[in-house]
């Protein structure tokens, strides 16, 4: 207020002093403001029922950023105001043909138009530049501003999303019965066309690296029922329909996330003996949790929708959790033994016969085993027969013949025929039999014990191998279920984002595109 009084005082002194330093512009300012007793607090109308028409346009010089977490759009704009003030008219010929006059905004009436949906409490422009006045009273005011407007974020298809942000301007102290807010017009071939779009100067505009502008319409809105008293409520809204450029998120989020997700399939190929099946799956799960945390830090805390990448991470984390559960089951079956568990016939039929054939698991049949394994089994199975034959042979042969049978044949001696036990004197047969049994009984018992242990060991190993095969079958079955689901789910989720396109027209149901290429006459 002190500056205004100083300006008035300076003008008055210059005018009334009569000094030669007074030029025509100073005289004009004095006539308009002092002599005519200009009151900047009064609307520029001749009658109280008249309405002041304010024309607005917006020039965008830079789309600075869109902070999703704060839901704030920061833009650098030039806000153009235009109106007529009959009190600021003059005859240019009387003032050395002055065609334009520049005045501080503190000296004249200006419409108190503010950004309604601001997000930082700054309603007005950042810099109050001079107003331009023409002899016919046409006043223009083009202040620059950096607006931080509220922009509701739709996170449903993040990072393949598009947003509809707006800058809504309204009069702070006047209603629609006192001033009207309209879009500025442009004259082309003698016709007036309203500027129903945000003006962008290609030479002065700085393109944003993350967002691409699709539509930039402007529209006047009237709300006659906004207030109970019927006072019309109006605003002029400039819309920015922008689409995200997803390259940053594809390179830094999606690609590493997908690659790490498919590392969970390695858990199916690792043998249970390695001890790394469970740790591999858990490492993948922790990596996905980190990606989910990073994503949540870039999005607003909203319960209206789940972002696309969030859906993918939750989907993958569910599958990886299934892999971890599968690893636990497989390890449980792998380390089972006959001493702790019994393998039922039903389990053998399902996991050792039916499922391996369906899953194309290679398991050699007994008929396809190598010859040395068949010979070993044949020798093991016929050990008892050999022992019984040896016992019969020892009953027939005497000890001397057994010891010197080959030597006697080389020296031409004829082997003595030993009578069968059971012929001759019974007492002699019994004595001979007892003598033979006493000498070889311990050897036969030892051999039978060895055979028994071998059979038990073979049966034990076979049972353990069957439990291992059951675990491998479950592992293979889970791999054939989880891996295709992971691949198809990944494709389906990200294909959804590919079909999320901005609308062809700015407003649904309105065929007009609100662009400078297709203006419509007022």
From Swiss-Prot:
Main localization, broad class: membrane
Keyword ATP-binding tagged: no
Domain of life, source organism: Eukaryota
Topology, Extracellular side: 22-245
All ranges on the Cytoplasmic side of the membrane: 334-476
Gene Ontology cellular component list: postsynaptic membrane
Disulphide linkage map: 151-165
Molecular function per GO: acetylcholine-gated monoatomic cation-selective channel activity; transmembrane signaling receptor activity
Reactions the enzyme catalyzes: K(+)(in) = K(+)(out); Na(+)(in) = Na(+)(out)
Subcellular location field: Postsynaptic cell membrane; Cell membrane
Family stated for the protein in its record: Belongs to the ligand-gated ion channel (TC 1.A.9) family. Acetylcholine receptor (TC 1.A.9.1) subfamily.
Role this protein plays: After binding acetylcholine, the AChR responds by an extensive change in conformation that affects all subunits and leads to opening of an ion-conducting channel across the plasma membrane.
Oligomeric form and interacting partners: Pentamer of two alpha chains, and one each of the beta, delta, and gamma chains.
Protein's recorded name: Acetylcholine receptor subunit delta
């Amino acid at each position: 207020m002190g500056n205004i009084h100083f300006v008035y005082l300076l003008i008055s002194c210059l005018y009334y002093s009569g000094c030669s330093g007074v030029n025509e512009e100073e005289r004009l300012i004095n006539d308009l403001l002092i002599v005519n007793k200009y009151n900047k607090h009064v609307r520029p109308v001749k009658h109280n029922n008249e309405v002041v028409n304010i024309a607005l346009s917006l020039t965008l010089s830079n789309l600075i950023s869109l902070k999703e977490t704060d839901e704030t759009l920061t833009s650098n704009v030039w806000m153009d105001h235009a109106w007529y003030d009959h009190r600021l008219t003059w005859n240019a010929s009387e003032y050395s043909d002055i065609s334009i006059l520049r005045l501080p905004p503190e000296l004249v009436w200006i419409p108190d138009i503010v950004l309604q949906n601001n997000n930082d409490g700054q309603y007005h422009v950042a810099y109050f530049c001079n107003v331009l006045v023409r002899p016919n009273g046409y006043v223009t005011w083009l202040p620059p501003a950096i607006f931080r407007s509220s922009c509701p974020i739709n996170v449903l298809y993040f990072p393949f999303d598009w947003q509809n942000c707006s800058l809504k301007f309204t009069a702070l102290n006047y209603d629609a019965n006192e001033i009207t807010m309209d879009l500025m017009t442009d004259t082309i071939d003698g016709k007036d066309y309203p500027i129903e779009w945000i003006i962008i100067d290609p030479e002065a505009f700085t393109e944003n690296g993350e967002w691409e502008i699709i539509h930039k319409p402007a529209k006047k809105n009237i709300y006659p029922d906004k207030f109970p008293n019927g006072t019309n409520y109006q605003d002029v809204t400039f819309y920015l329909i922008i689409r995200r450029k997803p390259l940053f998120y594809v390179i830094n989020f999606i690609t590493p996330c997908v690659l790490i997700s498919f590392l969970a399939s390695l858990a199916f190929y690792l043998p249970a003996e390695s001890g790394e099946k469970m740790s591999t799956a858990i490492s993948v799960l922790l990596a996905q949790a980190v990606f989910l945390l990073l994503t949540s830090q870039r999005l607003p805390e909203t319960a209206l929708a789940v972002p696309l990448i969030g859906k993918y991470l939750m989907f993958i984390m569910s599958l990886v959790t299934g892999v971890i559960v599968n690893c636990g089951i497989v390890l449980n079956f792998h380390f089972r033994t006959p001493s702790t568990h019994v393998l039922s016939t039903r389990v053998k039929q399902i996991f050792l016969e039916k499922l391996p054939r369906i899953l194309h698991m290679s398991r050699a049949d007994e008929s396809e085993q190598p010859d040395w394994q068949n010979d070993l089994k044949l020798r093991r199975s016929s050990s008892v027969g050999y022992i019984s034959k040896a016992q019969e042979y020892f009953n027939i042969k005497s000890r001397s013949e057994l010891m010197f049978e080959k030597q006697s044949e080389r020296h031409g001696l004829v082997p003595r025929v030993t009578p069968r036990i059971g012929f001759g004197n019974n007492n002699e047969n019994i004595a001979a039999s007892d003598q033979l049994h006493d000498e070889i009984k311990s050897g036969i018992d030892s051999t039978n014990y060895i055979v028994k242990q071998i059979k038990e060991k073979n049966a034990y190993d076979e049972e353990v191998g069957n439990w291992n095969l059951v675990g491998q079958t479950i592992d293979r079955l889970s791999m054939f279920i989880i891996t295709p689901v992971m691949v198809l789910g990944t494709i389906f989720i990200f294909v959804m984002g590919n079909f999320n396109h901005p609308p062809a027209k700015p407003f649904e149901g309105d065929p007009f595109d609100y662009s400078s290429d297709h203006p419509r006459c007022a």
